[in-house]
């Protein structure tokens, strides 16, 4: 198929059967080009480019570049945004001639080698290379660029020299799912690098101290969402210690799934230093047994597990979210005036107390066999979810907020509109989908004696999750009510109890 796009601004071609797409002619109006092959011919389909479009700004090609093509840079010299998916990058020199690239994305298992010399002297800001067979990558040509973001993912690279990036103005460096065993961050210890991501690489040691004056965000694993458990353990990760004690500007550390980590150092008594700026620390799926975060006065979010038996959150006066996967403790009492969200998982715990957490707003508990959970004093608790547990008794609070019914609608709407927490394809769900009020599974006794009058919101959102117990096998055997409960509510409770074969007890 031959195409001559003379007067259009945007050209999009999808091939369902034609194995070759040839572009020829000249166009001064074309600004965007999008070409792709369907899966059946993706491996063999190729683009033959022999056209000239000097004003094109964006190129998006999924498929191979034919060896018969002219250099893409000579065809589209002023292209700023170039995305090449499942490509082979074509013959040597296929990318020569570009004058003003800002973003370049390349992926494809047929890419086995790449010479970055075509980028030398260009003001490129973002370079992403993923899912290739490149084992060596010479960064020297990037020395004279203005590269801000470098992202390398799923490439068999074993060694990477970072020195050429030192003066480019690099802001974000990401290396994931590669075979790099060592990394010298002194080579990029400039004044600009604020985000570092090193995930699932067989590094035996990771020293981030050279970035102590600039680094703000560190990824060695995943960021944890409050309403999900961690989804993946990175098996390539080898380093066991993560020393953060020297960091002066570090705000977020995301390490969920980094299964090799046993120790996180937050202070160094010998050097009289400690990290003070941390706001988020995500360490689900690690081998950390104990952690003392008491000195982190700015900490807002903490997730730690799977082997944790001790966690000191004293003096964390701004802590709002806490997630613990606890394998050893049988008695856990939390005390925090700021804590709003608690996620807890621990099969051995027999007593879990949160009565000294007055601002507690949402609680989700998994895999617990505590005899009782008393939330009577938690009068701000609007969301409670218990899964895969065997709880003897749960005592509900009487929510003190006058507008708590309206609060449900506000929060459900807020979380439904959040593109991160609403991403179902990632296993992340909204408040409404995941909790929707008090959702109790496998609890023998439900105590609602704090209530003397049941509003419609309380019935719908707390007690019966939409006026009905959804899963009959998980309904309570006993419901404790206040003997002063108004008669109409007693009647409603008895009707519900009869339906689920539960006993009503006056208190």
Language-model regions: role of each:
Residues 91, 457, 488-490:
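Extracytoplasmic/secreted cell-surface and envelope-processing proteins
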Residues 12-18, 34-41, 60-67, 83-90, ...:
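Concave beta-strand-loop units of leucine-rich repeat
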Residues 4, 72, 97, 185, ...:
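Glycine-centered beta-turn/loop sites at beta-strand termini
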Residues 21, 44-47, 59, 69-72, ...:
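Canonical leucine-rich repeat
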Residues 5-8, 26-31, 52-57, 75-80, 195, 216-217, 230-232, ...:
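Leucine-rich repeat
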Residues 376-423, 471-507:
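Leucine-rich solenoid repeat scaffolds
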Residues 1-43, 47-68, 73-80, 215, ...:
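LRR N-terminal entry segment and analogous cap-like coil->beta motifs
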């Amino acid at each position: 198929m031959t195409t001559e796009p003379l007067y259009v601004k945007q050209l999009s071609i999808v091939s369902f059967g034609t194995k070759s797409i040839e572009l020829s002619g000249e166009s001064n109006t074309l600004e965007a080009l999008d070409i792709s092959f369907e899966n059946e011919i993706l491996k063999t389909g190729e683009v033959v480019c022999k056209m000239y479009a000097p004003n094109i700004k964006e190129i998006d090609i999924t498929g191979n570049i034919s060896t018969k093509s002219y250099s893409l840079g000579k065809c589209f010299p002023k292209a700023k945004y170039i995305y090449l998916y499942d490509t082979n990058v074509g013959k040597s020199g296929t990318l020569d001639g570009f004058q003003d690239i800002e973003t370049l994305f390349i992926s494809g298992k047929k890419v086995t080698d790449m010479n970055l010399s075509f980028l030398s002297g260009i003001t490129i800001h973002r370079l992403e290379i993923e899912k290739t067979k490149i084992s060596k990558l010479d960064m020297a040509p990037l020395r004279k660029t203005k590269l801000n973001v470098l992202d390398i993912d799923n490439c068999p690279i074993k060694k990477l020299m970072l020195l050429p990036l030192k003066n480019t103005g690099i802001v974000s460096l990401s290396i994931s799912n590669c075979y790099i065993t060592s990394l010298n961050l002194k080579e990029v210890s400039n004044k600009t690098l604020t985000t570092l991501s090193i995930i699932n690489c067989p590094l035996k040691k990771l020293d981030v101290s050279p970035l102590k004056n600039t680094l703000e965000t560190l990824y060695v694993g995943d960021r944890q969402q409050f309403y999900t458990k961690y989804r993946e353990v990175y098996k390539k990760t080898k380093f066991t210690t993560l020393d953060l004690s020297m960091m002066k500007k570090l705000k977020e550390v995301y390490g969920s799934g980094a299964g090799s980590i046993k120790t996180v150092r937050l202070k160094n008594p010998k050097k009289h230093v400690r990290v003070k700026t941390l706001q988020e620390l995500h360490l689900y799926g690690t081998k950390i047994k104990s952690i003392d975060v008491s000195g982190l006065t700015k900490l807002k979010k903490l997730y730690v597990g799977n082997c944790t038996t001790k966690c000191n959150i004293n003096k964390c006066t701004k802590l709002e979210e806490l997630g613990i996967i606890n394998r050893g403790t049988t008695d856990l009492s939390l005390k925090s005036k700021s804590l709003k969200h608690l996620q807890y998982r621990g099969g051995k715990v027999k007593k879990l107390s949160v009565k000294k957490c007055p601002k507690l707003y949402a609680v989700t508990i998994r895999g617990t066999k505590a005899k009782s959970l008393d939330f009577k004093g938690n009068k701000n608790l609007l969301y409670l979810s218990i899964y895969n547990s065997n709880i003897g008794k749960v005592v509900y609070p009487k929510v003190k907020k006058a507008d708590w019914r309206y609060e449900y609608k506000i929060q459900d709407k807020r979380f439904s509109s959040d593109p991160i927490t609403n991403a179902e394809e990632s296993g992340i769900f909204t408040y409404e989908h995941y909790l929707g009020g008090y959702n109790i599974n496998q609890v023998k006794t439900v105590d609602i004696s704090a209530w003397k009058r049941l509003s419609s919101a309380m019935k719908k959102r707390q007690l019966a999750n939409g006026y009905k117990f959804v899963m009959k096998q998980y309904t309570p055997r006993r419901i404790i009510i206040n003997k002063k409960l108004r008669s109409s509510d007693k009647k409603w409770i008895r009707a519900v109890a009869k339906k689920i074969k539960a006993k009503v007890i006056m208190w």
